[in-house]
Amino acid sequence: MATKKTIEKATTKPVKAATKTTATKATKATKEPKTVPVEKIQEIADQAAQAQTPAAPAPGQVQVNVDFLKTTKVHIAMPCYGGMLTESTFMSFIKWANTARQLGIDWTLETMVNESLISRARNTLTAKFLDMPDATHLFFVDADIGWEPWHLLVLLNRDVDVIGGLYPMKTMPIKWVVNGFEGAEEGPDGLQEVSKAGTGFLLMKKHVFEKLKSHPAVKQYKNDIGLDPKFDQHLKTYFDTAVRQNRYYSEDWTFCENWRDIGGKIWMDKRVLLRHSGSYVFCMENQEHLMKTVGPMFLQEQQEKFGIKFTDKDGNEIKKITAA
């Protein structure tokens, strides 16, 4: 799925004779990097999916360095249990493919179906990525995450070792799949250091895994699932569950802890707000819970921020939301 780059042949033009002076010596001009505003990227993406609503408005005054992006090759890895993915994720890839083609950005995609053990799925996908000599970044995205092309492009443009975007847990009120910590470093334009980030939308440079080999928790394991033997050398427990501080950690939390153990940093771009699709059971009990927890906060926020008044079907103002 990699894009083909067009190479233009250099042409030689005749140069008119000119009087030589010391003041008119030829100098090599410094080439300015090509940049594209994220609004333009969103416009390109929407050409492929007019009906899809963006996950979040594209931030103004933000440029991505396309010349830099062309020096990268991101390998997108998606665990896809049962071969299923959501409509939101499908539309995201349609947009991404169209945008990457028009910008001339190289990328590849690997999915894994019917692997019920998510930690082994991630380690297998990582092993295949590490066997690709020209791939520079591994990008994990889950099959239930909705995203925009500019989300991935701004993460690549950050040029840090490990960085993710914000996606909600499948709960209301919204809680984000991320953990902060006291004294965390802050960078420009919404860049924030965190202690843990979910692998549902996480970008990692290749050398991260080379460095993680030194961590005692990262161990080689046997290829007993029928993979090509060429991947054997890369089969390591980069993503595994663990018990730390008397807590049971998922494979993404453990990855983050191991990386920070050896001096690495986990970053989050707070501009990258994503969609997390899931099912919901519609019943009276859930309605009561939702109205009690979310309803009052939503009503108060909308009234305070925007002066919005909510009315019932008879036109009477609703000043308080209660469960039916």
Ranges and model annotations:
Residues 118-122, 252:
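Conserved donor sugar-nucleotide recognition element shared by glycan-biosynthetic enzymes
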Residues 137, 161-162, 266:
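Short, Asp-centered acidic motifs that coordinate Mg2+ and/or phosphate
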Residues 124-137:
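Active-site nucleotide-sugar/metal-binding loop of Leloir-type enzymes
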